[in-house]
Amino acid sequence: MRLSHLLLPAAALALAPALSGCGTDSLPPTADAAWYIQMIQTGTCQIQGHDDQLGAVTSTDRTKVITDQVDGGNVTCTVSGTGKFDVSATTTYKDLSLSVNISGLSKSATADKPVKGNVTYASTKTIAPYAGECQFFFEGTKEAIAAGKVWVSFICEPGLTNSSSATGSTCEVKTGYLLLENCETEVTAEE
């Protein structure tokens, strides 16, 4: 065997790590989410009060997230802006679904001065989707917002309404937490 036949493959192997990044874009991190919702039975609410969660999150602890396209989870989200942020997200996992749209959410939002946004929530416990306006705010020291991520609390008073109900079932969300990470930072044409 000639020496030149051995040197060419060895040289190619030596250069492979240096050339592996050429001409390729690195993939962005995969979006992930967690949320908790406590719906209570008040007024015209026609379903039993209950808690539901995707992953595990509170205002102070982030224990588990659901990652887009892992184990059947779907997370699509955008958190864009500077100073004031627009948040758009749809999360689904098994029988759980939560969609959120918030305009102008800033770090200064408090329980006394929240920012309004829209929520649509569904699970086997609600039978059909409930939707309505909610109030979003930051509590605790860990909740925050920046381009591509948000961790925020919310309540929905007077509540979310099931529009398919003949009598208009409206149920209050007493406590809610939303965590979104690795989201898009710019609104795309499809949104």
Identify what each model region corresponds to.
Residues 1-9:
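Bacterial N-terminal signal peptides that target proteins for export
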Residues 1, 55-59, 74-76, 87, ...:
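Generic low-polarity alpha-helical segments
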Residues 37, 51-58, 68-69, 83-91, ...:
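Extracellular/mature segments of secreted proteins
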Residues 23-131:
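An ectodomain-focused feature that recognizes extracytoplasmic/extracellular
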Residues 17-21:
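C-terminal motif of bacterial Sec signal peptides marking the signal peptidase cleavage site
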Residues 9-12, 16:
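Domain-scale selection of a single, long terminal region
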Residues 103-185:
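Acidic, glycine-rich flexible loop segments
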